[in-house]
Amino acid sequence: MTSTKEIKNKIVSVTNTKKITKAMEMVAVSKMRKTEERMRSGRPYSDIIRKVIDHVTQGNLEYKHSYLEERKTNRIGMIIISTDRGLCGGLNTNLFKQVLFKIQNFAKVNIPCDLILFGLKSLSVFKLCGSNILAKATNLGENPKLEELINSVGIILQEYQCKRIDKIFIAYNKFHNKMSQYPTITQLLPFSKKNDQDASNNNWDYLYEPESKLILDTLFNRYIESQVYQSILENIASEHAARMIAMKTATDNSGNRIKELQLVYNKVRQANITQELNEIVSGASAVSID
């Protein structure tokens, strides 16, 4: 039978673990709120750039930008955004499953995939898979700078412009709320126009100087950069939300485990006391008989 001392040591150990997970939960809540604020403030920027591009391209039907050109798919590129750290439940695992499924589907029709990786977790997984990694960036922190991302994004854009890559996708975890984060894979290039009522509306609030087609190059690059940056913010917010949930679950489980150990401790202690009483009674009986 386990001794009361061993059970006490287990209770102390689980209690210490509970304190750690509770602290990590509170830190994750604080970081999630800050990142969520930055993430939500950045969404309108990406949406408006897309609307401007839709409007400009609609007004210049004779001008065909390379980012709008649909061509036969011989090779694809994928930007994968993961976390640098663990302890966030199945956040990375669920994303990697979808990414690998998509890559395998392209591989079945002999279409290879080149990768741009953000985050240590994606690097460790796809390095083991033997994937062709064009560039990587890790340890971006809580508030990544756009300058840190431009080089990696520029590499895959250069590959696309040189027609060595025909489609570019981006994979990340989209933040819905603190309880829901969804693995998402969207196509970045070629750019697909939206049949947006605002874009087709003649009443438009913008004038373009210089001519609209001269600014499309800049607009497209800014759009791609903003989409990647926004996706990274979405993934960071998802990471903190997932970690908050994981740590809350761990804290609750620790509490339940402490209760179970306390019950076992009481039973063992009671059994020991009962045994000692029986020994005392037996000893007293033996003395009285003598």
Swiss-Prot record:
Annotated protein name in UniProt: ATP synthase gamma chain
UniProt similarity note: Belongs to the ATPase gamma chain family.
Taxonomic lineage from the root: Bacteria, Pseudomonadati, Pseudomonadota, Gammaproteobacteria, Enterobacterales
Function summary: Produces ATP from ADP in the presence of a proton gradient across the membrane. The gamma chain is believed to be important in regulating ATPase activity and the flow of protons through the CF(0) complex.
Record keywords: ATP synthesis, Cell inner membrane, Cell membrane, CF(1), Hydrogen ion transport, Ion transport, Membrane, Transport
GO molecular function per UniProt: ATP binding; proton-transporting ATP synthase activity, rotational mechanism
Source species of the chain: Buchnera aphidicola subsp. Acyrthosiphon pisum (strain APS) (Acyrthosiphon pisum symbiotic bacterium)
Domain of life: Bacteria
PANTHER family: ATP SYNTHASE GAMMA CHAIN, ATP SYNTHASE SUBUNIT GAMMA, MITOCHONDRIAL
Subunit composition and interactions: F-type ATPases have 2 components, CF(1) - the catalytic core - and CF(0) - the membrane proton channel. CF(1) has five subunits: alpha(3), beta(3), gamma(1), delta(1), epsilon(1). CF(0) has three main subunits: a, b and c.
Subcellular location, record wording: Cell inner membrane
Membrane topology: Peripheral membrane protein
Pfam families the record matches: ATP-synt
GO CC annotations on file: plasma membrane; proton-transporting ATP synthase complex
InterPro entries assigned to the protein according to its UniProt record, in alphabetical order: ATP_synth_F1_ATPase_gsu, ATP_synth_F1_gsu, ATP_synth_F1_gsu_CS
Cystine pairings recorded for this chain: none
One GO process term, biological-process aspect: proton motive force-driven plasma membrane ATP synthesis
